[in-house]
Amino acid sequence: MDLVKPEEISHPPMDQLQGLEYCIDSNPPWGEAIALGFEHYILALGTAVMIPSILVPMMGGDDGDKVRVVQTLLFLQGVNTLLQTLFGTRLPTVIGGSYAFMVPIISIIHDSSLTRIEDPQLRFLSTMRAVQGAIIVASSVQIILGFSQMWAICSRFFSPIGMVPVIALTGFGLFNRGFPVVGNCVEIGLPMLILFVIFSQYLKNFQFRQFPVVERFALIIALIIVWAYAHVLTASGAYKHRPHQTQLNCRTDMSNLISSAPWIKIPYPLQWGAPSFDAGHAFAMMAAVLVSLIESTGAFKAAARLASATPPPPHVLSRGIGWQGIGILLNGLFGTLSGSSVSVENIGLLGSTRVGSRRVIQISAGFMIFFSMLGKFGALFASIPFTIFAAVYCVLFGLVASVGLSFLQFTNMNSLRNLFIVGVSLFLGLSIPEYFRDFSMKALHGPAHTNAGWFNDFLNTIFLSSPMVALMVAVFLDNTLDYKETARDRGLPWWAKFRTFKGDSRNEEFYTLPFNLNRFFPPS
């Protein structure tokens, strides 16, 4: 047997992912683009419905209030997605709600000045205004860091080895929203997971008139089948005598969104009244803004990879963070009960469909805005059981995590230093947030429990985020352990040309602003 030569089994690093049908600036035919945009819209509904469904009842709101918040959040998702794809990073990213904001928001909900209000509707409005005020003030963090280019300066300390744990945990860190939620209704969650894998992977070469229809629309095909199956189970009375929580997770008629939704409703700023401002609430909310900044930074790099673009230069990253801050400000003004962050599941769908086109995401933003104003039609799609979304998350979150691991190709993984940094960062990025979650479940408060509530919320929010913990550990270790002698091992030569906008000719192709706006905002 002949010896295998190393060059025959090695895989040279590639700064652009190969194998996509359409990259960031190539567009499918209009019909296909519209259908793919609708698929991204359907996927974005999961977060848009789940966050208000958790928070609104805690605030004293009814089903009508929940529908208005869902519509408002969906409307702002569309607006912020358009802003990001036009003027921000210009990557094909959906900007959705962020779970990072739930800790400070729940703290505001339990504020003694609000819980003493007896009238549920008045308590809901008062709490909403307090949340709005905190989000409006906290949004200034990302606006300042982004548009002042301070985040560009910070991101120059990020090497491939330092970003691997951050991007990987952008996906892996969401494991509790995957199969643990599928397990709440296995009879519809497991079939959805299996069908989605079969359609997107095993049947991806099935073509109709030379078009890979199953691969492109695996999500919609599987969703239609399982949603119809879930409706049959509901109509047949399969859940009639099951516990209430099981019915919430499995039935297709439990959300009350359709009956509570108006036919037409256009969200507008300050629709809940004038926001109220509290320094403690605002400071705690700033932690959530910092977390969404880190999570979005990792997600932007993953999106660039799955859109077959080059790594975004620091200037572009900072610009995107600035516009995300504008989006958080709009969320506060409109009252969405959430800030903004890049939707990780929609990034995963770029890889699943092999379509990284910017136009597709802009079309999906149009669907979000349109259906948020047509309440009944939007509520129809929003009534899909969340278990179905969780099944898809199991695949898409894992795909995004693997994109993070793919950055190891630029580094020397025969280096004990690099093995130490990656391993410790990944482990602590999973272990520390899990400790904070377990502690909170048992003690009903986080490990940080002092007399200063804002300080508790700040620390608990920071350390509940896996990408945040991973970034602190990985970037610190990477920039303090033999950093001068190991530039090549860290992968810095590969990213050197992407540190400035003009360092690579492809940057101009992928990241130049439209309408010749680069004249007024020259890249650094």
UniProtKB/Swiss-Prot annotation:
Tissue-level expression: Expressed in cotyledons 10 days after imbibition (DAI). Expressed in the minor and major veins of cotyledons and leaves, in the shoot apex and pedicels. Expressed in the root meristems, root tips and lateral root primordia.
Disulfides per UniProt: none
Keyword Nucleotide-binding: no
GO molecular function: transmembrane transporter activity
Cellular component aspect of the GO annotation: membrane
Entries under Pfam families matching the protein: Xan_ur_permease
Subcellular localization: Membrane
Its membrane topology: Multi-pass membrane protein
Chief place where the protein resides: membrane
Keywords carried by this UniProt record: Membrane, Transmembrane, Transmembrane helix, Transport
Keyword Transmembrane helix included in the entry's annotation: yes
Database matches in InterPro entries: MetI-like_sf (IPR035906), NCS2 (IPR006043)
Membrane-spanning intervals of the chain: 41-61, 69-89, 91-111, 133-153, 155-175, 179-199, 217-237, 282-302, 359-379, 380-400, 419-439, 457-477
Family per similarity comment: Belongs to the nucleobase:cation symporter-2 (NCS2) (TC 2.A.40) family.
Stored PANTHER family: XANTHINE-URACIL / VITAMIN C PERMEASE FAMILY MEMBER
NCBIfam families: NCS2_1
Protein name as it appears in the record: Nucleobase-ascorbate transporter 2
